[in-house]
Amino acid sequence: MAKIIIPTPLRKFTSNQAAVAVQSGTVIESIRDLTLQFPDLDKHLFNEDQQLRGFVRVFIGEDDIEDLQGHDTPVQQGDTISII
């Protein structure tokens, strides 16, 4: 499992959890797992076309996924994903 750090404004949708355990795979799969656990997050992270909203930035550790493989960046067991 990996974990996603939840930004403070979105914690009200995760029962005030600062971090949530998610399945590993790719970044997009991990974020989808998060929204399956907390469906109210979906509209805040994804647009009508089910693409991540343009203002959502995602990091694995300190690396911006846009500098890696984007949404298809592999997520390993124990990785920390941050949503900004």
Where are these regions (language model features)?
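Ubiquitin-like/PB1-type beta-grasp interaction modules and other compact soluble beta-rich domains
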Residues: M1-I84
